[in-house]
Amino acid sequence: MSLRLTSAFVLFVISACIGAVPPAAAQSEPPVHAPVQANPDIRLLGGEWIYVEDRTEGQPMERLGPPMASKFSMRVEDALDAVILNGHGSGHRDVRIKLDGTRTEIAGENSRVVRYRGSWKNGVFEYEVDFGREPGKPGIGILRRRFLVTPEGLIVRVAVDPPAEGGEVESVGLYRHAEDIPLATPAKGTIADVAWIAGAWVGTRPSGSSIEERWSPPLGGAMLAVSRTVNTSGRMVAFEYLRIVEREGGLVYAAQPGGAAKTEFVLTEFGPTESGGKRAIFDNPRHDYPKRIVYELSADGQLTATTGFLKGGTPRRYEFTREDR
């Protein structure tokens, strides 16, 4: 398996825009949020924003997720007359949106021209993207996004035209700067508490690709691992360095997809499952995706790893058996 830590989380960029999901705190009924109050300072839009929770009403838990990319950035020009977009999910970088309604045109696929147009009014930054879809053809024609800075963070509203069949007219999400997102509360534990993860684990993805994680036995307060994914052509398409280490009375899970800089998750919960197995949960609310990594060992010795958001959505699931079985 590869617990790939993609910064843009492309899976949600389009599907969530087409109609995603209720507040992360919702179980069966959405919570009631106080009316939001705009901050008129456009400069507060600047910086990198991380998805926190869904604020769309009326969707089941499995559809919870961000209304656009789980991480994006904006930069307000010094003259306060334009905003530069990055990571907004349209496949374009450094898109300059003028606030006077002037169109920004970018060459798209199949010689089509994608047009951006934005405005700033009453504390709300809004822009639309016209993908130039031909009438009667499938796909998104116009994408509209609104950004409102409030005391609790950035409220993002996304609507598509035409709306997806069965999808919401508008999706809403809360974003914050990473430093404004509370850290996870760590659980007390030692490396012995997750020793059951040790071993050589192999599996097969629905695509036919083979996956493996090879975990060393616990020693010196740590466990080390390497993950690898090989496609049906026999080519390695992903690898990852992993480790679990003791720190300040708890455990930290560190992942380096492709050998990149590490991302850390803290152990927040561990223990037996209702079915007689074992479970360990590692969280990092400040990461864009995944925010949670869960390992479970079933009573019959099968290992499962899932990656996803803290609440809701459809986690990615990886299933393993011991190589020597």
Please describe what each predicted stretch is:
Residues 1-4:
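N-terminal secretory signal peptides that target proteins for export/translocation
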Residues 7-20:
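Bacterial N-terminal signal peptides
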Residues 17-29:
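Signal peptide processing junction and immediate N-terminal pro/mature segment
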Residues 28-325:
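Hydrophobic small-molecule pocket/channel-lining residues, especially in calycin-type beta-barrels
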